[in-house]
């Protein structure tokens, strides 16, 4: 809840899944393998290895696989949602691809709407009281 309160107060969320867009980070395994996120420690997302690759090579691979750019591809229904400013589409690991448009939507969307319908007014009160 503290990230939602912070968002309502104008702060950037600390939790990456509440940013809506992936940030540059590295998940590093014990063998030095580097991945763009701890939820994407999978062969197809491997960026390189700190034992054998330069950081600029690892960064180029991140751009090559389009990891951060993909997190920006949201359906118009998501972008126009009244809760988008606080939900931000969530983490890309929880998104389904619409093959026709090439855009994504969070598969918890309806649950988020139910949650915000019930809790957002109270969260706004807390945020206002904290300022």
Task: Map each language-model feature to its residues.
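C-terminal accessory region of radical SAM enzymes
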Residues: 1-8, 39-82
